[in-house]
């Protein structure tokens, strides 16, 4: 009996010794699989990224970096330029620069996504190691991350700054962690590092300030030490510089999500607190995304909103964080204080933004980076627990998230293979093959290109236009009232307006055509293009 128990113990030890190797193999295999599949099939693109690329391709004619050209609403024959304040520059600048090396945009996107995914994996490994977690815990966490939907999403659906922030954020956090003595020279790398975060994604400003503030107060008995005051002064100077630079060089120069008004949620602060805490728990596993898939899928919608899922997840999040704090408070106290202070600061900023009725969405992706900070602690607390109930609960939730992540990648890849390939080498999810082919027949080079305006129902479709001027809206998502409120004045020699066929019956197509107020409504010629149609008027 003793020999049997001893053998079992040695077998368990051997299994633990193999965990890092097995997880490393899974990380490498899946990352390569995502990259190869993305390079072969090519990704599609979300509209936010599409807007950025629309601006990127007009910058050669603009007066300065990050300015884009679009039609003058008072006279569409003219162009006006505007600072692109809504979208982070990194999401289109980096793939755009890679494209200039000679490859098409679709492949350039995969190169950038793969590079920042690998950079992020190395960064999170280094950061988790700096926190003092053992290799088995680190590799389990990384294997789970790679299996998740958020990690593989941009290999099929390019989401811009999310991948970039995943790649650079851990290195910034590691730098702050290494410099948490807060010598005066630390201000410069803190500010420069935050600038890199902002280049990757605008919310990097929030993360940078929160991480610096959290590191200033995470020391043992920090509240009882005078040195904490010095650290807070250094942190305050760094954060003030970050904020001032961001405010004057970016925020005041145009519209951002934090400056667009919207309506408050009916439940107010109760919902916002529940959502924020839930996202800090769910974002590392894409669990709210899973909730959307299960309960809000347009083809089989079960719930009217995600609210019920948020309220159901909230107690699970609180319980998870409580268990993590109790189990790690003795051996990882500084890590816990740093992470909870950082997450608390980020949560407060988002609560203030939501309560101010600003149009920051309710997506869990906004909390991905702080959630990944918490995730390594959660993994260690649960997989090292003596309680089989805790280990089983962890395995069940993580297993479900990983299954969803990998299968959703396969599903999205298959779906992409059926979308038409665009001229720039990425898949067009919202355009028909007939529409893409027709654009190529009307997008002619030469002196008449500047006298042609092609208006499209989503910005990523506008990237099919290489010569003529182009513009777009979000016809499928804009309300009918908003479309009716638009007015484009003036005339141009050739005007083409593309809309989805389904908009012909709900009044949106008519509203878009009537928004060109100097064109007679009975003067349009319609060309059917599969599930899309094109209306045009050409001046003789």
Question: What are the functions of these language-model segments?
Answer:
Residues 107, 124-148, 166-167:
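Transmembrane-helix signature of polytopic, membrane-embedded enzymes
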Residues 24, 28, 192, 212-213, ...:
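Signature aromatic-anchored transmembrane alpha helix within multi-pass, membrane-resident enzymes
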Residues 34-85, 95-100:
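Extracytoplasmic loop-helix module adjacent to an early transmembrane segment
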Residues 397-462:
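Membrane-embedded, lumen/periplasm-facing catalytic core of multi-pass transferases
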Residues 162, 168, 200, 206, ...:
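Hydrophobic/aromatic-rich transmembrane helices and adjacent perimembrane loops
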Residues 111-132, 171, 326-327:
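Transmembrane-helix motifs of polytopic, lipid-linked glycan transferases
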Residues 228-319:
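Membrane-lumen/periplasm interface segments of specific transmembrane helices
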Residues 130-132, 136, 183-184, 219-233, ...:
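Membrane-interface helix-loop-helix junctions at transmembrane boundaries of multi-pass membrane enzymes
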